[in-house]
């Protein structure tokens, strides 16, 4: 997705092309802001650590971990590139959980993105269909405003960042 941005390629066409190879498939080939959760990040770190303990470097696994962390910054950088100075800007965050259909925020990219936005002086309005109580608990010390609907979060915002691909967030009705 990052290369597609730089060369002007349609990431959806590239995704479909790569995914058409039966050896790869397209189930998990979606661009995004990084993975999270309680299992995959921990397992990747453990695998890399075990290899290092035995004198081996798993370069691909270590690159996966490094790129995942970088992806969280890509969202922030895109917002900064689009909006310039973020001080006083309002950014709506759609999706707080690490994946749809859960309230689990462990290792969720949203926490990193929100933290960076707030550090840059932006106002953050957040919406998630089920993870807002968990987000309030985890980020209780941060001045995040929680909206009752996705549209309330977006109203008057300078930008909207979709961080969790809930079905209801994918195709907004902007005439709402």
What are these regions (language model features)?
Residues 1-176:
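Structural/interface elements that position substrates and couple domains in central-metabolism enzymes
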């Amino acid at each position: 997705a990052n290369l597609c941005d730089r060369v002007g390629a349609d990431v959806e066409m590239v995704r479909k092309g790569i995914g058409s190879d039966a050896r790869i498939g397209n189930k998990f080939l979606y661009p995004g802001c990084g993975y999270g959760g309680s299992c995959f990040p921990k397992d990747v770190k453990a695998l890399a650590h075990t290899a290092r303990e035995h004198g081996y470097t798993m370069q691909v696994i270590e690159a996966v971990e490094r790129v995942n962390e970088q992806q969280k910054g890509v969202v922030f950088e895109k917002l900064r590139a689009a909006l310039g100075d973020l001080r006083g800007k309002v950014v709506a965050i759609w999706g707080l959980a690490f994946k749809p259909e859960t309230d689990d925020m462990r290792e969720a990219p949203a926490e990193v993105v929100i933290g960076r936005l707030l550090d840059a002086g932006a106002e953050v309005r957040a919406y998630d269909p089920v993870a807002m109580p968990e987000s309030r608990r985890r980020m209780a010390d941060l001045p995040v405003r929680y909206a009752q609907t996705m549209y309330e979060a977006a109203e008057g915002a300078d930008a909207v960042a979709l961080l969790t691909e809930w079905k209801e967030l994918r195709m907004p009705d902007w005439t709402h």
